[in-house]
Amino acid sequence: DRGTTALITYMRTDSVRIADEAQKAAADFIENRFGKDYLAPGGKRNFKTKSDAQDAHEAIRPVDVTLTPEDVKPYLAPDQYQVYRLIWARFVASQMAAARFHDTTVTIDNGPAQWRSKGERMLFPGFLAVMPRGKDEEGVELPALTKGETLKLNSLTKEQKFTQPSPRFTEASLVRELEELGIGRPSTYASI
């Protein structure tokens, strides 16, 4: 039991700079927890800071990467836990190797009709081991097929689709647009 302790670094920053000691601690944690294959090439990853970033503080990250979200969950309110889990996972994932996939495209010909399906198969999870993709980001895994194979149609659904206009801004997309245009600071976005 450590008593009262800070869990994250200064949060009012837009810097992506990470201290060397924090990168080393993350690399040690990743190697111990997942193995050497999960380390980013060279053992660490650096990201370019935007030209208008306030770089007085380093990036928002866990103070101690070994304090996993599950370790601190009993001491945090649900909202606090969710925020810490996100910060911890993003930080650890940022220092891990990329995920690798095998992309597949299948074209099915039936007389004049042609259907095409794209899928992927994960070869190596990399950073997705700590930060899985959301349901809307997951790819479809196609079954193994051979060229010339005859397929059986189980069902066919006819759908009519229409193009949709661009959606209105959400709070997140508005903040993202303001950041890209260099308008305001992260501390001012909270009031939006």
Regions found by a protein language model. Give the residues of each.
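Core catalytic DNA strand-manipulation module of type IA topoisomerases
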Residues: 2-192
